[in-house]
């Protein structure tokens, strides 16, 4: 129901703003909005088309891992933690391995691997779901972990900063890591409170503290490197790990006498089917966002926030980067465009340019993930997924602003 109201609101607000624009003399406003519907629907299909090959590849690899027993080994290894974080999932269920693969891919910034493994996890959780059109607690927790977007290697952002001539492209690395860690911890805590999961259980608490320590070690390690070394290490590590996972699954299949090629083809067929299923959901959410943005409502929201901050007598320097923060839950490509625009207009080494990069790396595209993940299994009632995801995003935004002032203010 929440997505239903949000989607309707996109169009109603857009129409109201279009009428205001027309009254102020903008006779092209309705054409802009209508054009955005065609552009957004085309973009949604192109995204799905682009996902088809990637989904086929990674679901094929995952199928090899399933038949070789690798996924079950991962599930058993992670059972002590995941059975407490996802109490409704049976112990040692194969979905635990898929969840781990997805989280690991996200942490390494490997989006091409994260989405297929995430969709595989959703399909496995749907098999346990007694109400097929309603999201379960494990699905929501998993979704929030994705929307909070814990990434320890933000390779793309660092590459963009280098291309825009930043003096130190990697100077946002530690701030991004700190902000995304806050967003992830906030997402886990908020969702756990909502689902009445006791996060003070020794195993869970130790895991969260261990995660903080792990990120701290990475921050310290990369802090000892110069920018060229950091870029080389991050790129090399992420790609070596990715290729290592593929090789591990294939060799495990060979060792277990699995017909690796046939298993891959079987999984790849599932990838094509999944890509087709998500098209209507992507079209719906991207068209709604496109209409909202084309009407000028997004600009008005940003101007309103800027005015409110200034009236309170606070430092409003961060407002220039807010378009990236506001766009991020709605559209990944839109937020990326806002980040690049901020670096172009203000400079990559300006406060706004750096903060926009931290915003881009601190959370993920909540509504896109909702549309793709829930759409792949035909979930229509997301329950508290939207609220928890957006609250985690808000925590990430607040953390990003705070960290930016600490490092660059």
Regions found by a protein language model. Name each.
Residues 1-53, 159-293, 311-312, 384-409:
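Signature of multi-pass transmembrane helix bundles
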Residues 5, 32, 44, 60, ...:
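Hydrophobic alpha-helical context, especially transmembrane and signal-peptide helices
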Residues 12, 58, 67, 107, ...:
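Short glycine/serine/threonine-biased micro-segments
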Residues 30-127, 256-345:
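Membrane-embedded alpha-helical segments and adjacent helix-loop junctions characteristic
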Residues 35-38, 45, 94-96, 131-139, ...:
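Hydrophobic alpha-helical segments, principally membrane-spanning helices and signal/leader peptides
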Residues 100, 104, 139, 230-233, ...:
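Generic signal for short, ordered secondary-structure residues
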Residues 113-114, 121-161, 166-196, 322-409:
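C-terminal transmembrane helix pair
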